[in-house]
């Protein structure tokens, strides 16, 4: 159960089209993470079991492009602009790879992240 290689972004709500984060910038993002499930279908964005969410904790605040989060997160969020809402579909080599994340993400799992950048 793995999506196509790399990171694919599906825009649900466009951002302002100009303010994208750069390597080393701090971003603040609301998100929900799901395991990729090819039985769910394209209309459901292949969202399988939820493994994490910022809901109830507040948005994630992190530096982007410096290896503090998975590679697919870095790549996908750097493609977003301020105020954008998107689905990031991430292959396992851009996620947690062969090691997975014990107890949450099996080895070699693709991921689907629902991400929302603040409106600014």
Swiss-Prot record:
It catalyses: [protein]-peptidylproline (omega=180) = [protein]-peptidylproline (omega=0). SUPFAM superfamilies: FKBP-like. Residues 1-24 are annotated as: Disordered. Residues 24-120 form the PPIase FKBP-type domain. It is an enzyme of class 5 (isomerase). GO terms for cellular component: cytoplasm. Keywords: Isomerase, Rotamase. It comes from the Eukaryota. PPIases accelerate the folding of proteins. It catalyzes the cis-trans isomerization of proline imidic peptide bonds in oligopeptides. Transmembrane segments: none annotated. Its EC number is 5.2.1.8. Belongs to the FKBP-type PPIase family. FKBP1 subfamily. PROSITE patterns: FKBP_PPIASE. This is FK506-binding protein 1B. Signal peptide: none annotated. One of its GO terms (molecular function) is peptidyl-prolyl cis-trans isomerase activity.
